């Protein structure tokens, strides 16, 4: 059993996508809200399944719940088809590329629903790339829905101390501070440098 600290990278995903959108959003005609939603929505299905799994075992069975989440992420996450599909339909690079191909006709149709969804998929792609690079052996399934098990083995894990999680915490914190400065410092300086 790996000692899992309580980690939540959703804020980092959101900050990274917001910085990308600020720098490149106008140039590549991204729908801002869609791109930002794409930074956080991929993790929601797994979160909901995990909560449901815990609630079920805690309140509707007589089984001991100690270690239940280790079972969830040690067995269900890797082997249960529902868990795999739920987590990867917005994480797998293969399925995201398929979505982008299907939606590509909307790339220049700004303001349409199709353009919004294409921007959302681009946001999910950024999320997926970050997850692939920051999960030792539990990142997105690369070729889902064609293959349900192949994952990239990153040398770094944002949560696993055996794979530099303690060091990565500081890298992630630094990235967030720099990007938050990029996002908000110019507005802050402008606001307080106006003559009264």
Where are these predicted regions, by residue range?
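N-terminal membrane-targeting hydrophobic helices
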Residues: 2-196
